[in-house]
Design a protein with these regions (language model features):
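A short loop-to-beta-strand structural motif that recurs across blades of beta-propeller domains
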Residues: 2-5, 55-58, 101-105, 152-157
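Short glycine/acidic-enriched loop and turn motifs that connect beta-strands
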Residues: 1, 50-53, 94-99, 145-151
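Short loop/turn segments that connect beta-strands within beta-propeller blades
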Residues: 8-12, 60-64, 108-112, 160-165
Length: 184
């Protein structure tokens, strides 16, 4: 069945609480930042990045084994990861840092790059997170900066693969998130 996260909404604030039920060790692999996690079937994938060195890791058993590297030579600065069907979509920059080259990179589960889509015009100040909008079409929700100097103001854009502009956008001000990097 469908999992529902417990939460409360008081009219202005949505609070969601969740308890982890599974885990896997994610090895160093020369990269220090886990930039995103996605589940494809029963396999968990994650991207771990340091500078322009990004590794795609996979585990099939969250409790008994550690994740192993599927691909170590992804030349992107990973910012996030989501999945649609059997494909992974990595939010990334072609340089270390945020903004200037924000791209969605389509990967197969072996880490082969199948396509790229520049969303730099949609989020020129850099992006922080990505999630699939509906799980079947190549439609995403991108969390990005409205203004890098105000980390409490975030913009969310619904983006179709290869579209010239966002289908819709909304901004959350005084979110209290600070530098949030996860969007699910």
């Amino acid at each position: 069945g469908k999992k529902i996260m417990p939460g409360t909404f008081n009219g202005t604030t949505l609070t969601i609480s969740a308890t982890p039920v599974d885990h896997a060790l994610i090895p160093d692999e020369g990269a220090t930042n886990v930039a995103g996690i996605a589940i494809v079937g029963s396999d968990m994938y994650c991207v771990k990045t340091t500078g322009l060195k990004t590794t795609l890791l996979k585990t099939t058993d969250y409790m008994a084994t550690k994740a192993t590297a599927v691909r170590k030579d992804l030349n992107w600065f990973a910012l996030g990861l989501t999945k649609i069907g059997n494909y992974l979509y990595m939010l990334a920059e072609d340089h270390k840092g945020y903004g200037g080259s924000t791209t969605i990179v389509k990967l197969d589960t072996k880490g082969n790059q199948l396509g790229t889509y520049s969303i730099n015009e949609i989020c020129p100040k850099g992006a922080l997170g990505i999630t699939a909008a509906d799980g079947t079409n190549e439609k995403f929700i991108i969390m990005h900066y409205a203004d890098k100097n105000n980390a409490g103001t975030l913009t969310f854009s619904v983006v179709d693969w290869k579209a010239a502009e966002a289908a819709s956008t909304f901004t959350v001000t005084n979110s209290g998130f600070g530098y949030t990097t996860q969007l699910q």
